[in-house]
Regions:
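NAD(P)-dependent Rossmann-like dehydrogenase/reductase catalytic/cofactor-binding core
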Residues: 198-258
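Internal alpha-helical scaffold of NAD(P)-dependent oxidoreductase catalytic cores
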Residues: 98-108, 124-160, 171-210, 255
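Short pre-catalytic strand/loop immediately N-terminal to key active-site residues, enriched for Gly-Thr
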Residues: 109, 158-163, 215-219
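Small-residue helix-packing motif on alpha-helices
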Residues: 28, 38, 55, 71, ...
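Non-catalytic terminal and connector segments of soluble metabolic enzymes
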Residues: 4-6, 23, 48-50, 55-58, ...
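Rossmann-like NAD(P)(H) cofactor-binding subdomain of soluble oxidoreductases
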Residues: 15, 35-38, 44, 50-127
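NAD(P)+-binding Rossmann beta1-loop-alpha1 motif at the extreme N-terminus of oxidoreductases
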Residues: 1-50, 54-56, 122-123, 184-185
Length: 258
């Protein structure tokens, strides 16, 4: 499949690298106004250009990883030269109905919400699409399954998916940073503290994904009566650990919905 990504920022580049590394038999083009910072992608067999229309007529799918305010300008530029291309949008807040309206209901459309872990084959990419475009969406679902997981969800949950899956990357990293800072305070150098904190989160996530149990069941394995784990957890909860995370996620969702 030939994939044309418009928007060579962090997300677009992550998707391109993920496809190049983990998905077979695909050709990728990435466009960006200033290509100096993405020239290195050519080392992975990825074509780069500052022209959004470069190679686009050969593409099977066009992926939009641009800002909301850029959508109208980009569509005005590319629609005259693409025919029957599937348009997959990763634009925050752009509904399928809005995208169909902007494209005069003439193109198959899919809504995707990957995250920047795509370049490591670890993205949680939520996908939604109109039922009539199921066949068009199928290869896109397969593509993003190569880059991690790709659950198909009801579009009404896409804003929530943005917060949980995309913003969630930053939330997880902030937890790791806090653990790193605590590690320094209790005696580790910064590099060692970071390595321990990051690997611990990776291990916890791997256990959860492979055993497919509720997180609390795994927590119970770590905690012992009067042990150091339970007193630490209780202290965190007394200071609003879970509630602050929940409030943060809900606040992010409110920001998206305006």
């Amino acid at each position: 499949m030939k994939v044309h990504i418009i928007g060579g920022g962090n997300l677009g580049v992550s998707i391109a690298l993920g496809i190049a590394k983990f998905s077979k038999n695909n050709q990728v083009t990435v466009t960006r106004r200033n290509i100096a910072s993405i020239q290195y992608l050519s080392e992975y067999g990825i074509a780069v250009s500052n022209d959004n229309k470069y190679n686009i007529e050969e593409a099977d799918v066009v992926i939009l990883t641009i800002k909301p305010y850029q959508v109208d300008t980009v569509l005005a530029e590319i629609l005259p030269v693409i025919k029957n291309k599937t348009i997959a949008s990763a634009v925050s807040g752009l509904s399928l109905e809005m995208l169909q309206t902007k494209t005069n209901f003439e193109y198959p459309v899919v809504r995707i919400m990957p995250n920047i872990a795509a370049q490591f084959g670890e993205s949680a990419t939520c996908i939604s699409f109109p039922e009539k475009y199921k066949d068009n969406a199928s290869p896109i679902v397969d593509l993003f399954q190569d880059l991690g997981t790709a659950p198909v969800i009801d579009e009404k949950l896409m804003d929530a998916a943005t917060v949980l899956g995309a913003c969630g990357t930053a939330y997880a990293l902030r937890y790791i940073r806090a653990s790193m800072q605590a590690g320094i305070e209790i005696g580790f150098d910064s590099n060692t503290a970071l390595a321990i904190a990051a690997q611990t989160v990776k291990g916890a996530a791997k256990m959860l994904l492979e055993e497919r149990v509720h997180p609390e069941q795994l927590i119970d394995r770590v905690t012992t009566p009067q042990g150091c784990t339970i007193v630490g957890l209780n202290e965190m909860e007394h200071n609003g650990f879970s509630s602050s995370l929940i409030k943060g996620i809900k606040t992010s969702l409110k920001q998206i919905k305006g």
